[in-house]
């Protein structure tokens, strides 16, 4: 007869008699019917127990799935070589990107003020990254500037961008070069008092030059230089005023002709110079015109002479 280590199971006999224990009998005698409150509590408890039991079953199933999924992974990792396992662990321990907003478990253990500072820093970096992505610019200092194609291109190119909160600097229109048409006429009307100041100053300088006593030679020479400079400025200003006056008269005549049904005629730069030259010589005598022409000829000849190359020495 062979003996096995396993115990034999008893055969199931439905007519088998079981002896009743004494303590079971005592419990049955001591049983009392439950009260109404207990019955209400029991009637509500099965639903709660079923919910709790269902939740526990779900948790157990999730744990079993995780453990079942992790066991094959552990078996696969155990079969890998040491180098492969090292690379896999390094890949898992890679740092998070700067723009990621996921919270590490170590951050939860830090004090509240540290976590607040870290969140503020992350928000600042994210806002800076968003601003740099939205605002066009240049990748490097030598690269061309990138502009958004969704914004309309301005007619005027901004060479120097002013700071965002900069106030406009005051300008002196007397030194503005681009004054034409009505702007120039308005400027001359608004600053007509400057001509009076200049005339008064020129009269005082002439008095200083004509005075024989109480003026040193150095002061007299200084007054002569100032007077010559102011006279040149006045002549150039008068010439400029005359040019604007001639162009205004020409435009006025053309407007009258256009009203009569004729086509407008616009002067070219060369024709404007001829018109100004004719007006300049119209108020001169014959001798003054000859002197002006000779002076102009010498000036042009001097410029041409400067442009000529130096004469080469001949070989002996």
Swiss-Prot record:
Keyword terms of this UniProt record: Coiled coil, Nucleus, Ribonucleoprotein, Ribosome biogenesis, rRNA processing
Coiled coil: 218-260
Principal location class: nucleus
This protein's record includes keyword Transmembrane: no
Compositionally skewed regions (Acidic residues) per UniProt: 48-76
GO cellular component, one term: 90S preribosome
Record field: compositional bias (Basic residues): 88-97
UniProt biased composition (Basic and acidic residues): 10-30, 142-160, 227-259, 301-316
Subcellular location(s) per record: Nucleus, Nucleolus
Region (Disordered): 1-177, 227-260, 293-316
GO terms for biological process, alphabetical: maturation of SSU-rRNA from tricistronic rRNA transcript (SSU-rRNA, 5.8S rRNA, LSU-rRNA)
Domain of life: Eukaryota
Pfam families in the cross-refs: RRP36 (PF06102)
Family: Belongs to the RRP36 family.
Function per UniProt: Component of the 90S pre-ribosome involved in the maturation of rRNAs. Required for early cleavages of the pre-RNAs in the 40S ribosomal subunit maturation pathway.
Quaternary data: Associates with 90S and pre-40S pre-ribosomal particles.
Name of the protein in question: rRNA biogenesis protein RRP36
Species this protein is from: Pyricularia oryzae (strain 70-15 / ATCC MYA-4617 / FGSC 8958) (Rice blast fungus)
